[in-house]
Structure formats: C-alpha cells, structure tokens
C-alpha cells in the first residue's frame, strides 16, 4: 500500500515538523593525531585579529606580547579585537544603572563563596594540564601532585584545606627563585629472556628530582595545554580547545562564580540556567518585545552569530570589567579576582604533541616534538604547515607559544556573557535616544537580537548601531552568518522559537539506546532518558511506549538476556533457562536475568530492582543484593549516579539516574597495556591516592567531612582518629588492653616511617 507522506502532516502544526529534519545519524567525527596544527592556527589567527596593537616583552618570561586594547578603532566588516576600555567601562556603568545594586550584591555572594570553598573543588573537571609532568592528567591527580610539590618546596598555606589559602601558595610560588619537582621517566633495556632465549625490551619506571628556575616555572604556571575538540558535527575542520593548569584554575573559578552570580540576575542571560528554566526566561524577553511593539511598531529578530568570539575577546578587558564591578570592595577580594585575567594576559599555549613524519620508502615513522619546531629545517613540511611555523616562530619559548590576546575556548563563559548582555542593555530607549530600541538574549558567544522600530529604516539603523557598539568592545557580529526574520521565528542555542520554543525531539535521538556501562546502569539510564524526554521534549505517550519496547529489545540483544521461555539461542540462553525453570516467581527476575519487562510509561521513575523486589524469590533477593559476592567489584553505593548522554548538538550532558547497587553493577577491569608505559608510575600514584581516600572514608564514616588533599595530611588525620577511637573503645570496654596497645604501636610505627621518609 502506498502512503502519501503529506498525510502525516495534516494534523501537525508546521513547527512540529522540525524533528523530521534531523541530519545527524551515525557517529560524530573524532580527531586523530596531534592538535599541534589546530593550536598554531588559533595562535596565528588571534594575533592576526589584533595585529595593529602594540608589541611588548614580558620581563619575567621574555615572551613577546601583543596588546590591541585602546589602539586603533575597529573597522567595519573585518573581525578584530580592538576593544576600547572606556566603552567597556561605560557599558558596565549603564548595566549597573539599570540593575541597581547588582554588582554589589554579587560581590557579597562571591566573597562568602571565596571564604568557604575547599581545595577539593579543584578535583572536579576532567583532564587538566599537570605542570609537574608537563602533560594532561585527571584533575584530582594534577591537584595532588601540585600540592605535594608545593609542600616539598615549603609552601604550606594549603594545609588549611581552603581554596583561598592554596591560591596564596600559588602566588608565593611565583616569587620563588626555583622550584624542585619530581618527574617520572622510563628507561628501556634490551635483555635476554631466560625462558624463550629471545631479546626483549625491559622498561623500568623511575622518579627523578628536577629543578625549575623562576622563568621555567612561570612558563609552566601560565601554560594552557591544548587538545583537539572531539565529536563536533557539521564542521569540516577540527579546532583546538585549552585545559589550564592548577595555578590558573582556582582563580578562574572565583571570577566565574562572580560572573555567574551576575548572570543569574540578568533577564537576557541564557547562562547559567538550562533546559526548561532557560526557555521560560528567554520566552519572557520575547514576550516583552512583542507586547511592546504595538500596532505602530515593527519587530524583527536576528538569529546571531559572532565571528571567532573568544579569539577577539581580551583578558585586559575582563580585568577592566572586574576592576569596575568590584570597585567598592575590600582590597584582598579585588586582588584575588584580578589575578585570573592578569594570568590570561600572560598565558602561553602549549603546542601539543608535535608532528608525526613517515617515510614511505624506508617505512620509518618519527615524531617531531613541539619543542623542536623553533629551529628545525622547514624543507620537510608542506606549504601550509611551513607558513604556520614561520608565523609562529617569533612567539615560541620551550615548545609553548606566547598568546596574550584572545581567551581560548570555554574559559570565561559567564564573564563574556555579562559583556554581551551589557551591550543588549544599551538598547533601551533611554539610551538609544531615538525611535528604535533593542533587547535580546546572550549565552556565551550565541545571541539573538530583537529590534523594534516604527519602520524598516529604523530597524536597519538599530541593527547598524548594535553592530558598531559591539565592535567597540571586541564583539564581531558576523553579517554573513546572521539572518533577520519577523519576531516570532528565530533560533538561539539550538532552541528553535516559533510562537514559543519548539520541542526538537530529534536532538535527543543519539542518547536513546544502550549505553554499555553495565547491566544495572544501562537499564536505569535507558528508562530515565525516555522519562526525561516525556517531561521536556514532547515525547507523547504512544511514542514513549514504543521507545520503551524498542529499548528493551535492544537491551536484551546487547546483553543476550532474552526471556527464559524464549526460543532464541545465545551463549547465555542455557544458564538463563535453568534460572527461569527453578524460579518460583518468574515476574521477579530482572530483565538482565531473562525476566519479563514490567516497565510501562507510568513507572519509569522506579529502579527495576525496587519495582520487582516484592515479586522476587527470597534466595534470588539474597544473590542479587549481596555485597560479598566475590565476582563483582563494587562501586561505593550511592543512590544517584551520573551518566553522560550525547545529544546531537552541543556538549555531552550529564544526566542523573537512580543507581541501586546489585551484583549487576559490575565495573570492567582496567586495560593491562597501560602498565607497560611511562603512565604506569602515574597510575600507581593515582591508585595509591584512591586507596588512601577509601581508607580515609572508613575512618571518618560521617558524611560531614570533606576529603583532604594530598596523602600526607590524610595519614596524620587517620592516625589521630585511630588513637582517639581506640582510647574511647578501650575505656568503654569494647576492646581489650592487648588490642589497645597493638593499635597504639601501629600508630607509632606509621609516624616513625613518615619521619624517615
């Protein structure tokens, strides 16, 4: 039977058809090889946008620096970073005038945060540049290494556990004439294997002490490591992103806390809220503009795109903003907040791994590390790479490039949003002093501009004025990529607005399916995704029911756990049939044990174990929830876990799901091959730190403590806690005298060992 596709849309309003335009099936592209070329592109482009600025040399590091601020005025059409300080300050002043007390209140909120934040805040976040090893590491390890090095160099303010005290150490470290660090290295030896009599390569991991002079240390402290951004759809070229080191992170965190607090109070800001809350906030602004444009006014909306937002931003502008925002605050607070932009004005971009060369004739491959790019003969490179290297050479120091202008991706999202909103704020009639006026939405580099005026000429004049005002603070609206429409239809941060925000359900499609973590988590994530889409994305009941059935089918095929009474033969079917036959209450079996599916769209919020608990045989309950099961290495039991789900557009989202720990919540073991590489020493450090943390949590069962940082302080805490507990237990008769003295002896031994070390 032929179906006429137009029939499908007879009852559907046009805006709902957006889900049928979904282009993103299949996997997104990932980057391979090094990001060195992309990073050089970024550095060269950033300097090109500011090329008419003034060159100076940093007295400490000798790095050449370009300062475009308060230089030439920007030109029409060409993107540039020529911001004017007085324009930025004036925009800030007007923002404060239309929001009385906003800066004052945000400063007070931030001051409280600054005094209360613990160092362990910095353990959040994924890969971080670890300056001690000069490469990326998980955040917790990078922090532990930094603190360990600080302490061995006599910087101990961090022992209080407050982030602000750790930052005091960072400041002191920059005044030191030298810093001593421990690095990992590996030796390779060719030895004969006794068994096979063949020659094999033996690797040994060593640690060695290394001294960094002031210049060397400062360069590392100011370095942002770069990587290639993965999984970007709809782009032909990859681009570089940056990960700052621990010295910068803490300062950035406080600046962003202040900016976040300001953004929360600005109705035009699309940050820091998300999802439905964001849609509601933005819909308000649109409603305001539409109701105000009575019959006499026209209203148009620009779906905006800025050219190279962060390469034209300038840390010096951010410094000016912070200086203004905090102008009546205590000196210490102003100093803490101004350090991040100052560090960014002096930042160095690490060029990554370097280039890989291969000779087809000799079947040889060799890596040219970034450090060698400064003086290698350029005849080996192709034309475009040669140009890049020639351009970047004057900026190179030790494999890093001096990059004073520009912000690198994703660093000051909140603060740059404040800057954007301050220009939107200037669109009020009392500031434009003419018949046109504007308002809009800003979320990091994405914006939507709504202009109202009595006629088309007025609209054009308003857009022009907005465009030029933006230029003066280093924001470059792209005329090529922005488009204008009657208000009521526009796109902003991948939300499509047509008389209200349209649910674009197809964006969520990639996150449906089986995640592949383990049987327990996958079931939970799968039903949670369906539940969330019913709440947020207009997923109707019939479609949801179908999605659920497809998910269960997918799940059973993934884990080969078809129902016990099925005819499908898999590797597991023999065992599952046996279980099915000996189970009295078959409804109680989990789907992953060949049980039936009891989920429907009404009970998606209940974890499967809870849903079936009353239906389970007693011995099945005992096997399922058995922490002593030797075949399962358990995660610590938490009621809520976080999964990373990939929407089609935008960053991977973190999604909470209920985690009931059972024998199905297994964790796959770590790949062995890492143990033969130079990472091994680092891995061992990480495992030791992890073990120490786990032990620490056994000692302090209350949830009130915050995990301390660095191994040494934990050991002290545990020893003193052990002594106190032992004394209490001994005096109340819970332990014998022999046990008590043995505990005391162990504590003394530990302290003795620490003294010798």
Curated annotation (Swiss-Prot):
Q: What is its EC number?
A: 2.7.7.48
| Chain ranges for the short sequence motif Nuclear localization signal as given in the UniProt record | 187-195, 203-216
User: Which reaction(s) are listed as its catalytic activity?
Assistant: RNA(n) + a ribonucleoside 5'-triphosphate = RNA(n+1) + diphosphate
Nucleotidyltransferase listed as a keyword: yes
Q: Where is the RdRp catalytic domain?
A: 286-483
Keywords, sorted A to Z: Eukaryotic host gene expression shutoff by virus, Eukaryotic host transcription shutoff by virus, Host cytoplasm, Host gene expression shutoff by virus, Host nucleus, Host-virus interaction, Inhibition of host RNA polymerase II by virus, Nucleotide-binding, Nucleotidyltransferase, Phosphoprotein, RNA-directed RNA polymerase, Transferase, Viral RNA replication, Viral transcription
Q: Where is this region: Disordered?
A: 50-82
Report the locations given in the UniProt record. Answer: Host nucleus; Host cytoplasm
Listed GO cellular component terms?
host cell cytoplasm; host cell nucleus
> HAMAP family in the record, alphabetically?
INFV_RDRP (MF_04065)
Q: Spell out the protein name for this chain.
A: RNA-directed RNA polymerase catalytic subunit
Q: Which organism is it from?
A: Influenza A virus (strain A/Gull/Minnesota/945/1980 H13N6)
């Amino acid at each position: 039977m032929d179906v006429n596709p137009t029939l499908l849309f007879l009852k559907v309003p046009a805006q709902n058809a957006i889900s049928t335009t979904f282009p993103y099936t299949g996997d997104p592209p990932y980057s391979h090889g090094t990001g060195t070329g992309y990073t050089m592109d970024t550095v060269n482009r950033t300097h090109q946008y500011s090329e008419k600025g003034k060159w100076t040399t940093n007295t400490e590091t000798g790095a050449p620096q370009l300062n475009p601020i308060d230089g030439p005025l920007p030109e029409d059409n060409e993107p540039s970073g020529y911001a004017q300080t007085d324009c930025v300050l004036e925009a800030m002043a007007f923002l404060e005038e239309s929001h009385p007390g906003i800066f004052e209140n945000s400063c007070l909120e931030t001051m409280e945060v600054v005094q209360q934040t613990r160092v362990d805040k910095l353990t959040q976040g994924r890969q971080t540049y670890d300056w001690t090893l000069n490469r990326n590491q998980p955040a917790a390890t990078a922090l532990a290494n930094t603190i360990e090095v600080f302490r061995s160099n006599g910087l101990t303010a961090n022992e209080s556990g407050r982030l602000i005290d750790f930052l005091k150490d960072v400041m002191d470290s920059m005044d030191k004439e030298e810093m001593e660090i421990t690095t990992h290295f590996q030796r390779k030896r060719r030895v004969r294997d006794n068994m096979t009599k063949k020659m094999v390569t033996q690797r040994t991991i060593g640690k060695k002490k290394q001294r960094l002079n002031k210049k060397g240390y400062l360069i590392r402290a100011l370095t942002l490591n770069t990587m290639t951004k993965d999984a970007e759809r709809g782009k032909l070229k990859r681009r570089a992103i940056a990960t700052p080191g621990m010295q910068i992170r803490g300062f950035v965190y406080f600046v962003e806390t202040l900016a976040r607090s300001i953004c929360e109070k600005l109705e035009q800001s699309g940050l820091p809220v998300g999802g439905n809350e964001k849609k509601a906030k933005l819909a308000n602004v649109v409603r305001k503009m539409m109701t105000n444009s009575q019959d006499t006014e026209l209203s148009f909306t620009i779906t905006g795109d800025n050219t190279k937002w962060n390469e034209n931003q300038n840390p010096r502008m951010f410094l000016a903003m912070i200086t203004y925002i905090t102008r009546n605050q205590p000196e210490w607070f102003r100093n803490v907040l101004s350090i991040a932009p100052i560090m960014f004005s002096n930042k160095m971009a690490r060029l990554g791994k370097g280039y890989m060369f291969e000779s087809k004739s000799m079947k040889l491959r060799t890596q040219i590390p970034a450090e060698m790019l400064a003086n290698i003969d350029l005849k080996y490179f192709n034309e475009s790479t040669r140009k890049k290297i020639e351009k970047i050479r004057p900026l190179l120091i030790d494999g890093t490039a001096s990059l004073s202008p520009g912000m690198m991706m994703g660093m000051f999202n909140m603060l740059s949003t404040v800057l954007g909103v301050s220009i939107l704020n200037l669109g009020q009639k009392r500031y434009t002093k003419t018949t046109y006026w504007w308002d809009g939405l800003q979320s990091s580099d994405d914006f939507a501009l709504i202009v109202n005026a009595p006629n088309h000429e007025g609209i054009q004049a308003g857009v022009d004025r907005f465009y030029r005002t933006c230029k003066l603070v280093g924001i470059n609206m792209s005329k090529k990529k922005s488009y204008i429409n009657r208000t009521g239809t526009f796109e902003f941060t991948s939300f499509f607005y047509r008389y209200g925000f349209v649910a674009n359900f197809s964006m969520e499609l990639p996150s449906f399916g089986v995640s592949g973590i383990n049987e327990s988590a996958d079931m939970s994530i799968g039903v949670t995704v369906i539940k969330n889409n019913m709440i947020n994305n207009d997923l109707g009941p019939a479609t949801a029911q179908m999605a659920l059935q497809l998910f269960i089918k997918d799940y059973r095929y993934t884990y080969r756990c078809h129902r016990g009474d099925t005819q499908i033969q898999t590797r597991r079917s023999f065992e599952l049939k046996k279980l099915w036959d000996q189970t009295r209450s078959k409804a109680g079996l989990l789907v992953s044990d060949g049980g039936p599916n009891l989920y429907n769209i009404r009970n998606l919020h209940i974890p499967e174990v809870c849903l079936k608990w009353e239906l389970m045989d007693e011995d099945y309950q005992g096997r399922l929830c058995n922490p002593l099961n030797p075949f399962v290495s358990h995660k610590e039991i938490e009621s809520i876990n976080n999964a990373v789900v990939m929407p089609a557009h935008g960053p991977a989202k973190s999604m909470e799901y209920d985690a009931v720990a059972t024998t199905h919540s297994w964790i796959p073991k770590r790949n062995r091959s890492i143990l033969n590489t130079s990472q091994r020493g680092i891995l061992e450090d990480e495992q030791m730190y992890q073990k120490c943390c786990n032990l620490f949590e056994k000692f302090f069962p209350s949830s009130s403590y915050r995990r301390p940082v660095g191994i040494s302080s934990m050991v002290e805490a545990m020893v003193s806690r052990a002594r106190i507990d032992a004394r209490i237990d001994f005096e109340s008769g819970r332990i014998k005298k022999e046990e008590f003295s043995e505990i005391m002896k162990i504590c003394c031994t530990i302290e003795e060992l620490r003294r010798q070390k």
